[in-house]
Amino acid sequence: MTYEGAIGIDLGTTYSCVGVWQNERVEIIANDQGNRTTPSYVAFTDSERLIGDAAKNQVAMNPTNTVFDAKRLIGRKFSDSVVQSDMKHWPFKVVTKGDDKPVIQVQFRGETKTFNPEEISSMVLLKMKEVAESYLGKQVAKAVVTVPAYFNDSQRQATKDAGTIAGLEVLRIINEPTAAAIAYGLDKADEGKERNVLIFDLGGGTFDVTLLTIDGGIFEVKATNGDTHLGGEDFDNRLVAHFTEEFKRKNKGKDLSSNLRALRRLRTACERAKRTLSSAAQATIEIDALFENIDFQATITRARFEELCGDLFRGTLQPVERVLQDAKMDKRAVHDVVLVGGSTRIPKVMQLVSDFFGGKELNKSINPDEAVXYGAAVQAFILTGGKSKQTEGLLLLDVAPLTLGIETAGGVMTALIKRNTTIPTKKSQIFSTYSDNQPGVHIQVFEGERTMTKDCHLLGTFDLSGIPPAPRGVPQIEVTFDLDANGILSVSAEEKGTGKRNQIVITNDKGRLSKADIERMVSDAAKYEAEDKAHVXXIDAKNGLENYAFSMKNTINDPNVAGKLDDADKNAVTTAVEEALRWLNDNQEASLEEYNHRQKELEGVCAPILSKMYQGMGGGDGPGGMPEGMPGGMPGGMPGGMGGGMGGAAASSGPKVEEVD
């Protein structure tokens, strides 16, 4: 059965979160580990693919095949300086196939595989979709997905593609700080007075500042700014560099940075220390046998951490100044400063923001980890026609984060849509030819704030040909920019004399996936999902066989039962059980069919013997004859109860040792 509504997903750099509107409120949904946020990690092993907590938990053992930070790659080029500098910190391998698109290379089931960042993000989205499905008990087909407000066109489009690959219809891409503003403002919508709210959103990998006015149910974004490459991970990097140097100093120049496992263990400890420093004045790192069997112990004070990251912390104030300038608003006119994102728990960050606003008390009324998904879930509810007293009259007016325009003679950037224009929007302008009898024009679309296109980001190009011969400046070419509510752009050009027109949806020809790529990835995703399910089914069958074998062993060793079995029967069961356990030990990665076959063989030996014993005891011919099942402590009566094969009874009863974390 398919869920009629839609879910809201906060697809984060380091953690993701999913919510749904239920019973007049947003429910943030916990995953199978009971956590309300899920690590944005995907791991590939010799036998399976792991997503979320399971992937992050094994990262130290498998650093080169555990992928995270896909959001720092999505919609970017391999040659991008940001990508090149990040690659120095990642244990997994990022390569390009010659088209300047970054792909992630891993070993999976004994083969070398490459994945696009969109595919990795789609796996995280798939995990969030499954978390929602197990809560709702229905299939989910639609979602609202959030992105940093400062994401450019190609990053937005790539995020939308990731949703498609995960089998989701992405109803809307919304900006994270705007989603957080909904979470903050939903219960204040009926206060009736206009409030200027600044959302300061510092997460694991991205940073956004958005200034909006909330008036009744109308959320109008005035300006937005940020850095798509600043967050908690950058603070972790500073700590890792600091402790790597300290290790070198204490251990005669030994450099652990060449050892990926040591580096990963150090990074995990640094992340923990950073969190500790938000509430304590100092933190201690202790790692046994970190590198070349040397134990490492070190302490760091909050003051030292603040010094290490001081420039990054102070750098967060520039976007705050820029949004106030863009909105032409004095900082004293801001009523509320709302903190979002886990990194805003850092005391120094709070202090800097508070001081900037003249010692203002910061608003911490919303959960910084969950606010974005909360807002996405509200928007998902509205977009699927949901009606509630709380959301009626809610209107989101977001803006374009960057100026959009075309290149004109001399490489000049001519703007059609200025940054911070409310979206959706449509703007047209008339251009002409540069030389006499020019048969066509080459239209290049850019985004950015600089006056020359060489300093801006090229989004895409197209040609308008078939212009009749005419002196320069005579033909009239109307260029129209249409920016939709997702912040995705389409551009058209029409020659007024002939009515000739051409258009493109900016799909960032160089960086985007083609339709064929997306279709291939959708089918790959389905294949991997089927393999995951088959792997789980094989593990269940293995556990089932093991449970059955051990419960048989316990049963025949139970004094109440042992006396009722003759030696030949007892030996037959013992031999069959020992043989099954020996086979299990040697075949940890067998197929579902093999496990089921072994189970049937074992049942074939044990069931008739136990049945005969039952009848001898006057217990009827089934497992229900004796109160509480059999005295040997067999789970749920007799597993595999005669003839029915081992269905779910023993397989699902009681905890399975293999699943304990």
From Swiss-Prot:
Residues 637-661 are annotated as: Disordered. One of its GO terms (biological process) is response to heat. It holds the Pfam family HSP70. GO terms for molecular function: ATP binding; ATP hydrolysis activity; ATP-dependent protein folding chaperone. The keyword Nucleotide-binding applies. Residues 637-648 have a biased composition (Gly residues). Keywords: ATP-binding, Nucleotide-binding, Stress response. One of its GO terms (cellular component) is glycosome. Belongs to the heat shock protein 70 family. PANTHER family: HEAT SHOCK PROTEIN 70KDA. This is Heat shock 70 kDa protein 4.
